[in-house]
Amino acid sequence: MWRLVPPKLGRLSRSLKLAALGSLLVLMVLHSPSLLASWQRNELTDRRFLQLNKCPACFGTSWCRRFLNGQVVFEAWGRLRLLDFLNVKNVYFAQYGEPREGGRRRVVLKRLGSQRELAQLDQSICKRATGRPRCDLLQAMPRTEFARLNGDVRLLTPEAVEGWSDLVHCPSQRLLDRLVRRYAETKDSGSFLLRNLKDSERMQLLLTLAFNPEPLVLQSFPSDEGWPFAKYLGACGRMVAVNYVGEELWSYFNAPWEKRVDLAWQLMEIAEQLTNNDFEFALYLLDVSFDNFAVGPRDGKVIIVDAENVLVADKRLIRQNKPENWDVWYESKFDDCDKEACLSFSKEILCARATVDHNYYAVCQNLLSRHATWRGTSGGLLHDPPSEIAKDGRLEALLDECANPKKRYGRFQAAKELREYLAQLSNNVR
């Protein structure tokens, strides 16, 4: 059974929203001339707005022609800079069109960090290069660790970047070769040799890897090859463009039962695909919430739209090196915390075991089971099942064992049976 926030909290929330709306209206009146100007101007053609002037301390330039030619345009409210203080994550919706195609399609633009995080990045670069918090980034970048691979360095190696981000917490050479070979911010992609990249491209690659590796996840495990991630389109300065998938998973929380069953089955299939695949890369989702998934409006397909916190472990290397307890199945510990979207895990263990149940645990605990809480609700995506399913009890038992197993290795078996049962339910309701 799912529950809403208590009435007092609900009223307080509504009061705060009304107060914020009132303040916003006052600000809009006071700034009406600049408001009109920002509405009429396409700021996505402005080099400084794109922060193209900060390259190579940026994420790439492959889409600059499209931005600067006016092919990318903010949607309605995205044009109002006055609203940026509400957009903490720096995520925008826009329309993109190719002149030859006619018509436009929706895209998502990301700065890959908040204003504060981006300012801290600049300060960090400057302090490392000059000892001062402000500097010319163009001059500073070649004096940082992001330039260490410039020149005649042949490969991107684990020793150079290990631990820089979740993606490379425990990188194998095979993974890093894949990142370089599929790097989309160069005209000469397709080779794993660093010498085929320009110095500026190498610095952009390393900066992206350290600051927010999401673009590299999308490029290395592309949707075109069946991976469940949004499609990467390109970057200009510090603005990255990805394909718009659809409404976030949260908007389906109260969808009809048959729809929620199908979405739940897809989520478990994603957990399986990222854990066990022919490439022998395990992609572990370290941040799992309703906001990090979206659903296609036409095909109803579930896609991961926030891939910043993905740890990739090379199972082939684990089996080859055989670290201590490498072949002992690892069971993630249930985390009954009082916050939303909690997960308990050890990155070191994820990197050192060949058989891990983390993705099943993350999906069951944070999305599907009665333990899932989000935006004041509880009960998970599969709340309030039909009476015959609730009476049978099998679904609830499988969800509980998947989230908080009572038997040793119980989650592995529960996840397998849950996938099969959801597939059966999904077929029955279609």
From Swiss-Prot:
The keyword Transmembrane does not apply. Residues 1-35 form the signal peptide. The keyword Secreted applies. GO terms for biological process: cardiac muscle cell proliferation; negative regulation of smooth muscle cell apoptotic process; positive regulation of protein kinase C activity; regulation of phosphatidylinositol 3-kinase/protein kinase B signal transduction. Keywords: Autism, Autism spectrum disorder, Cytoplasmic vesicle, Golgi apparatus, Secreted, Signal. Pfam families: PIP49_C. Belongs to the DIPK family. May play a role in cardiomyocyte proliferation through paracrine signaling and activation of the PPI3K-AKT-CDK7 signaling cascade. This is Divergent protein kinase domain 2A.
